[in-house]
From Swiss-Prot:
Active site, per annotation: D123
Stretch list, region Disordered: 312-370
Keywords: Abscisic acid signaling pathway, ATP-binding, Cytoplasm, Kinase, Nucleotide-binding, Nucleus, Phosphoprotein, Serine/threonine-protein kinase, Transferase
Post-translational modification: May be phosphorylated.
Protein name: Serine/threonine-protein kinase SAPK5
E.C. number: 2.7.11.1
Family membership: Belongs to the protein kinase superfamily. Ser/Thr protein kinase family.
Length: 370
C-alpha cells in the first residue's frame, strides 16, 4: 500500500468502499475497492479476482493487483473517469437510438469476449458498466463478483443478479446457461437506454417485486408510444426477451444482426477483435506497445499469489493498537459505516426477491431447462 496515496472516495456498496488512488511513482490514477478483512472475504471475492485477472479487453475494466492492509483486502483496478453509464442515463432521461446502439455494441463485444474466455458475468446492469473520460466514451464492464467460469466452477444455479435484469431461467433454481442469462441482461440494458425505464417493472409500483417477477416470467413488456424505436431494434429486443433460453438469440447472432452492425466502429469489427481472443496475441500487443505502462497493464500476480493474499485477508489481525483507515494511517471510521447501511438495504432487496420466489407458483414449463 505504500506506493499508493488516497485522492477521494468514488463509491460505496455492500462490498465496502471504492477509492480513487494515485500511484506515487507513476502518478497513475487507479480505482481501489476495499473489502473488510474477515468473513466478507469469501468465495465470491476470490472468484471475482481470479476471473477478472484473466480478462484483457478494451471494454472490460483492467485488473491490476490485489493487496492486503491491516483492515482490508484492496482490489486495484483501472480507473474509469467517466463514471457509471447509469448516471449518464439518469442525466439524459433516455438515449437516442444511435447512442444506445453505440454503447450496446461495446457491451456486447465485452460480454462476448468474457464468454469466449468461458466466464459469464451474471450481474450485468448499467451500474456495472463504466465509461472512460474520452469525448466518445469507451464502455468498461466491471464488478465480477457474481461471475462464474466454466473452467473453474460448476454451471450456475443460484439466484444471483439484480431483479430488474434477471432472466426467467435464473429464477428456476436449477442449472442454467449463464451465457444465455447474460444475453437477457444485455437486452434489459438496451431497453433501459432506449426508454429510460426497466422493461418488466411497473413504474407506478416499482417495489412490487412479485409483479416484476411475474412480468419477467411471462415476458410482459412494451415500448411506450412516445419513444421512437426502429423496427430492426424492436426485432432484436423481441429475440432477446424470450423465456426459453435455448430459443433466445445467441451472442453470436446478436453480433450479426442488422441493427447491431449499423455504424459498427472499426475497432469492434470481428477482424479487429480477433487479437483479444488469442491470448498470445494479446500478450504480444501489450509487450510491443510503445508505452511501458501499457506493457505493465496486466497483473503480475499469479493465481497462487492471489490465493495466498486472499487467504491472509480472511483472518483479522489483532494489532497491539487499533489500525485506522485503509492502510495509510488516516481515520476513516465514518467511511465504514455508510456501506453497512447500504448493505442492509441490499439484503432487504434480495431477501424480498427470494420470498416472492418462494411464495409464487412460477410456471417453468415454457423454459425447457434440462
Amino acid at each position: 500500500m505504500e506506493k499508493y496515496e488516497p485522492v477521494r472516495e468514488i463509491g460505496a456498496g455492500n462490498f465496502g468502499v471504492a477509492k480513487l488512488m494515485r500511484n506515487k511513482e507513476t502518478r497513475e490514477l487507479v480505482a481501489m475497492k476495499f473489502i473488510e478483512r474477515g468473513n466478507r472475504i469469501d468465495e465470491n471475492v476470490f472468484r471475482e479476482i481470479v476471473n477478472h485477472r484473466s480478462l484483457r479487453h478494451p471494454n472490460i475494466i483492467r485488473f491490476k493487483e490485489v493487496v492486503v492492509t491491516g483492515r482490508h483486502l484492496a482490489i486495484v483496478m483501472e480507473y474509469a473517469a467517466g463514471g457509471e453509464l447509469f448516471e449518464r442515463i439518469c442525466e439524459a432521461g433516455r438515449f437516442h437510438e444511435d447512442e444506445a446502439r453505440y454503447f450496446f455494441q461495446q457491451l456486447v463485444c465485452g460480454v462476448s469476449y468474457c464468454h469466449a474466455m468461458q466466464i459469464c458475468h451474471r450481474d450485468l446492469k448499467l451500474e456495472n458498466t463504466l465509461l472512460d473520460g474520452s469525448p466518445a466514451p469507451r464502455l468498461k464492464i466491471c464488478d465480477f463478483g457474481y461471475s462464474k467460469s466454466s473452467l473453474l466452477h460448476s454451471r450456475p444455479k443460484s439466484t444471483v443478479g439484480t431483479p430488474a435484469y434477471i432472466a426467467p431461467e435464473v429464477l428456476s433454481r436449477r442449472e442454467y446457461d449463464g451465457k444465455l442469462a447474460d444475453v437477457w441482461s444485455c437486452g434489459v440494458t438496451l431497453y433501459v437506454m432506449l426508454v429510460g425505464a426497466y422493461p418488466f417493472e411497473d413504474p407506478k409500483d416499482p417495489k412490487n417485486f412479485r409483479k416484476t417477477i411475474s412480468r419477467i416470467m411471462s415476458v410482459q413488456y412494451k415500448i411506450p408510444e412516445y419513444v421512437h424505436v426502429s423496427q430492426p431494434c424492436r426485432h432484436l429486443l423481441s429475440r432477446i426477451f424470450v423465456a426459453n433460453p435455448y430459443k433466445r438469440i445467441s451472442m453470436g447472432e446478436i453480433k450479426s444482426h442488422p441493427w447491431f452492425l449499423k455504424n459498427l466502429p472499426r475497432e469492434l469489427k470481428e477482424e479487429a477483435q480477433a487479437v483479444y481472443y488469442n491470448r498470445r496475441g494479446a500478450d504480444h500487443a501489450a509487450s510491443s506497445a510503445s508505452s511501458a505502462a501499457a506493457a505493465a497493464a496486466f497483473s503480475p500476480q499469479s493465481v497462487e499469489d492471489i490465493m495466498r493474499i486472499v487467504q491472509e485477508a480472511q483472518t483479522v489481525p489483532k494489532p497491539d493498537k487499533p489500525v485506522s483507515g485503509y492502510g495509510w494511517g488516516t481515520d476513516d471510521d465514518d467511511d465504514d459505516q455508510q456501506p453497512a447501511e447500504e448493505e442492509d438495504e441490499e439484503d432487504d432487496y434480495d431477501r424480498t426477491v427470494r420470498e416472492v420466489h418462494a411464495s409464487v407458483d412460477l410456471d417453468m414449463s415454457n423454459l425447457q431447462i434440462s
